[in-house]
Each structure stands twice: as C-alpha cells, then as structure tokens.
C-alpha cells in the first residue's frame, strides 16, 4: 500500500519510470538468482532454462520435445537443467536410481507435468498419476487382474474379432488399387479393440474422431501446462495459478472426454456382470482391497487406463510398421518368418507369435528407437539426494530421458538405425556385441512400470501377423515422411502418417 501511495504522488512519466525500474530490478533478481544462487545453479543447461519455463514451452509448442531434449544432452552432457526446478538425466544409472525402487515414495508423482495435466482433464487421480505409494500399490494389485496371463488369453478372441472386422476394408483397398494411410487404419483398428477390452463391450466404437479432437486440444495446451508447472514452485502466485487452472479447465477437453463414454453408458457396463476380465471389472474389484472409489475416481481410472493404453500402443504399432517398411530387408525377413510359421491363418495365436524371434525383435527395436514414454511422462519429484554424482535438492523435478538413453552410442552400436538383429540370439556374431540391452526399458521399471505392456504387445503381434499374412505393403514415398523429422512429440507422438500401396499376398 505504501508503494502505491508513493506512486500516486508522482507524475505519469515518473510512475512509468519507477514501474520500469522495479520491473527491471525484479527481472534481474530472478535471472541472477536462477543463474548463480539457486540450489541447481551448478547444473549445466540452456540460459533461459535457468530462470524461466521458456525452453520447455518452446519445445512443446514446436512439437519437437524429444529431439530438442536429445540435442541438449549432446551439448551439455548426461545431466541437464531444463527448467529452473527441473533436471533431465541421460544415463542408465540415473534411470535406475529414479525408477527402480519407488514403493517408499521417495521419488513421487506429486507436482509433475503429467499429474498436473491429468488433474486438469480428469476429476480424480488415476493409477498412472496417484502420488501415494501405498494407495498406488493397492490399486495396482486389483487392476492387475485385467492383465494376467489368464486375462490375456480371454482377450485374444476379442482382439481377433476386431481385426477381422477391418479386413474387408483392406481387401477393397487391395482389389481397387487404392493407397491408404496405414497409420490411420491401424489406429482405428486398435481403438475398437481397446474400447472393447476396457469396458466389456465396444462402448467407444466409431468415436475415434472425438478422441482426435481431444488430442489436438491437449496438444495445444502443453506450453501452458509447462508454464503452470513452473509457477507451482513460485511463492505468492496462488491467485494467478488458480486463474490459469480455471482457464484450462474451461477448455472443452473434459466435455469431449465425456462424449467418449457417457456416464449412463458407463453405469450400464458397471451393472453388467458377465465374468469378463476387462479394465472396468478390474477397477470394480478395488473394494476387495479396502478401496472405495467415488464416481469421479472410477471414471478417471477407466478413461486414464484406456486412453493411455490406446495412444502408446497405437503409436508403437504404426511406428513398427513404419520401420519395417522403410528397411526392406527387415520387411522381407519378417514376412518370411510369419508366412512360414503357419499353414493357415487360424493357427495365428498370441502364444505362438510370442515365440517368433524376428517379429518380437522388430517390436523391441522400435520401442528402443521410439519409446512411447518420454521425459515429461516419466517425471518424478525427488527427495534430497545425489543422482549421477549430482546433488539434487528436495522438491526438484527429475526424469531420465528414455529417448536419449536408448539412442546413445554409450549403450548401443549404430544407435540411430533400425537393427532388429541386435535382439536375436546371435546378435554378437552380427556385430552387436557392444550393445547393453538392459539400457532399453521403454515401459520403465519398478512399481510404476506400464501395467498393460503384455496386452499391448499381444495386440501388436496379432495385428501385424494377420495383416502381413494376408497382404504386401509398400510405402508410396520412402522419404516422404521421416518419423524423427516430421512427427510431433510432446507427451505423446502426433502427426505421423504411413501412406502405402496394398496388395493381396494370397
């Protein structure tokens, strides 16, 4: 109040000059503190990241987060400060330190980018974002029932059903000589699969366009969420933060989400009791662990698991086809393996596909090059500790960047190229004896590792094997779309495509 009274006694010119001087002083203080006095001032990184969220906002706005973070690590080393209160690591040792032992809650999900984004879109914490380790453990135990070997076996007929439903469209494309965006077809196919697996019936059938609108809204909000993450650790910004929260919450993301699965339809699924081991039934079993989920928590967990599982699996499915089609020798080897392993399409099963070495090598190599989770989705809030010989004060946001680690020459021979041979038994004879296979952990490790990874891999195997058994695919223009150059990356990959010619094989 005294400052305001003082300013009121000045002329307009003096008021402007004084306000400018105060602004310069405050800005200079922020810069000096961030660069020289902050507890993380010893960590190297870009100048703007030392005192502002601008580096992260810009990388997210450009949709080049993965490649730009990798470039930072190449410039500054394995430990990089990417925001005033955030550090990214690019070593296997750091990855193990952050994620391997999480049951004590020392490295928490609280305050991370993904948790904040989820809070803005959903009305309750989910298995993916819940910070309490004890609560997470109990919820994980019940939801795990949807991903047991028994559950996977029961899910296979549903996966095959939706694959078969897509076949007439591929047949027509092949017969008429059309070309298609294979990525779009694959995503639509898996959308129908996971909707059925999640809710016990095709509850989301035909609603992928609604999800795509939601995804575009989410993509546009990423820079603002990055700014909010920065503001969370600043003193005295609560009113501004709440205003920003209200603004983001007012965006139509939540309304689009409710269109995917209306609450009345969800209640019908809850009341249906047919013994199916779907995601919804698993969540309903939470009461067996003494957990009582209200309607918001129930809906949030169902949608969180479904959409996270859909996007990561659909991306890996498309990117595996992308790599196989670009590397023609790998394509020929894979087709030969699949077509010689079975006498009839009916013999194609998840159990037998899990034993095909080259198919699984192609999937593993794709996951190494393009892990579905990156630094933003894998953030943790650290305790006071030392990681990779670097002191980290309590409350710092930390992550290990899988994209950079899994493409590092420190761990892999010829790391930027697609070499499925590196995952075969005779890899050492083929020149990959310098690989450290344990450095590829695309599903993360520890208690927060991806719960649906086996379901995802089974779906990918079944779809790829069925399509390559029936059809031959060829890229329209092998250099027309380059994933690393043209796809967007933030929390997820976006804007990828796969234009192909399709021919019947038999």
UniProtKB/Swiss-Prot annotation:
Heme binds at residue 450. Its cofactor is heme. Transmembrane segments: none annotated. InterPro entries: Cyt_P450, Cyt_P450_E_grp-I, Cyt_P450_sf, Cytochrome_P450_monoxygenase. It comes from the Eukaryota. One of its GO terms (molecular function) is iron ion binding. Cytochrome P450 monooxygenase; part of the gene cluster that mediates the biosynthesis of terpestacin. The bifunctional terpene synthase tpcA converts isopentenyl diphosphate (IPP) and dimethylallyl diphosphate (DMAPP) into the sesterterpene preterpestacin I. The C-terminal prenyltransferase (PT) domain of tpcA catalyzes formation of GFPP, whereas the N-terminal terpene cyclase (TC) domain catalyzes the cyclization of GFPP into preterpestacin I. GO terms for biological process: terpenoid biosynthetic process. Belongs to the cytochrome P450 family. Pfam families: p450 (PF00067). Keywords: Heme, Iron, Metal-binding, Monooxygenase, Oxidoreductase. It is an enzyme of class 1 (oxidoreductase). PANTHER family: CYTOCHROME P450, P450, PUTATIVE (EUROFUNG)-RELATED. The keyword Heme applies. This is Cytochrome P450 monooxygenase tpcB. The lineage of its organism: Eukaryota, Fungi, Dikarya, Ascomycota, Pezizomycotina. Pathway: Secondary metabolite biosynthesis; terpenoid biosynthesis. The gene is tpcB. Its EC number is 1.-.-.-.
């Amino acid at each position: 109040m005294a400052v305001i009274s003082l300013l009121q006694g000045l002329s307009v010119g003096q008021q402007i000059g004084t306000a400018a001087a105060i602004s310069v002083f405050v800005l200079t203080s922020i810069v000096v503190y961030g660069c020289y006095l902050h507890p993380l001032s010893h960590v190297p990184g870009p100048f703007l990241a030392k005192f502002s969220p601008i580096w992260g906002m810009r990388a997210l706005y450009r949709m080049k987060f993965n490649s730009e973070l990798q470039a930072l690590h190449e410039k500054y080393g394995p430990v990089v400060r990417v925001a005033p209160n955030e550090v990214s690591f690019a070593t296997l040792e750091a990855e193990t330190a952050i994620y391997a032992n999480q049951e004590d809650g020392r490295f928490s999900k609280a305050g991370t980018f993904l948790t904040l984004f989820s809070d803005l879109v959903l009305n309750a914490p989910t298995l993916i974002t819940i910070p309490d380790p004890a609560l997470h453990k109990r919820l994980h135990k019940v939801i795990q029932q949807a991903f047991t070997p028994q559950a996977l076996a029961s899910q296979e007929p549903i996966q095959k059903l939706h694959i078969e439903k897509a076949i007439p469209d591929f047949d027509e494309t092949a017969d008429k000589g059309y070309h298609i965006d294979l990525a779009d077809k694959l995503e639509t196919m898996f959308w129908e699969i996971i909707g059925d697996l999640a809710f016990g019936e095709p509850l989301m059938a035909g609603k992928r366009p609604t999800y795509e609108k939601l995804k575009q809204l989410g993509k546009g909000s990423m820079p603002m969420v990055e700014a909010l993450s920065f503001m969370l650790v600043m003193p005295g910004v609560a009113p501004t933060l709440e205003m920003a929260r209200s603004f983001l919450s007012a965006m139509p993301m939540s309304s689009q989400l409710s269109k995917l699965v209306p609450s009345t339809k969800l209640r019908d699924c809850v009341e249906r009791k047919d013994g199916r081991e779907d995601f919804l039934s698993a969540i309903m079993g939470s009461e067996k662990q003494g957990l009582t989920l209200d309607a918001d928590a129930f809906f949030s967990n169902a949608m969180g698991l479904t959409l996270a599982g859909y996007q990561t699996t659909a991306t890996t499915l498309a990117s595996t086809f992308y790599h196989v089609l670009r590397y023609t020798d790998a394509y020929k080897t894979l087709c030969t393996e699949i077509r010689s392993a079975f006498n009839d399409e009916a013999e194609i099963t998840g159990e037998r596909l899990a034993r095909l070495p080259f198919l699984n090598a192609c999937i593993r190599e794709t996951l190494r090059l393009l892990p579905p989770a990156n630094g933003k989705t894998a953030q943790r809030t650290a305790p006071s500790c030392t990681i990779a010989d670097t002191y980290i004060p309590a409350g710092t946001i930390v992550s290990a960047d899988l994209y950079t680690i899994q493409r590092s020459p420190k761990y892999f021979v010829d790391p930027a190229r697609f070499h499925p041979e590196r995952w075969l038994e005779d890899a050492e004879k083929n020149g990959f004896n310098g690989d450290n296979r344990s450095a590829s952990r695309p599903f993360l490790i520890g208690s927060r590792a991806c719960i649906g990874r086996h379901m995802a891999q089974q779906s990918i195997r079944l779809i790829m094997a069925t399509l390559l058994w029936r059809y031959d695919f060829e890229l329209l223009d092998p250099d027309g779309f380059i994933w690393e150059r043209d796809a967007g990356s933030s929390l997820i990959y976006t804007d990828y495509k796969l234009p192909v010619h399709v021919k019947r094989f038999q």
